[in-house]
């Protein structure tokens, strides 16, 4: 799974997966370690979420991601992070350029 996420970030490709029972379509931006757990920070652009707010920034625990696929859809560039709530990482492994 890690290799798929890294490839999607490097190629700026949109990914889809199931998380907490919801279908997500996400622009992956950061793969890293937060509180000792591998996580993905992405901008969810389609799908659904328990919060109901889309599009929105979301952190995902890698261990809870299911049915991960790289889509044949590119995203143009790194989006601006609207707040500092996603800024803490123990280690950032890869950031979209």
Locations of regions flagged by a protein language model:
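Core beta-strand-centered patch of the WYL/Sm-like small regulatory domain
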Residues: 1-97
């Amino acid at each position: 799974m890690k290799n798929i996420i890294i490839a999607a970030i490097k190629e700026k490709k949109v990914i889809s997966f199931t998380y907490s029972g919801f279908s997500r379509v996400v622009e992956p931006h950061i793969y890293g370690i937060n509180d000792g757990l591998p996580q993905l920070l992405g901008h969810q652009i389609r799908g659904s979420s328990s919060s109901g707010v889309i599009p929105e920034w979301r952190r995902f625990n890698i261990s809870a991601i299911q049915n991960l696929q790289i889509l044949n859809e590119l995203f143009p560039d790194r989006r601006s992070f609207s707040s500092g709530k996603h800024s803490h990482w123990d280690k950032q492994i890869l950031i979209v350029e």
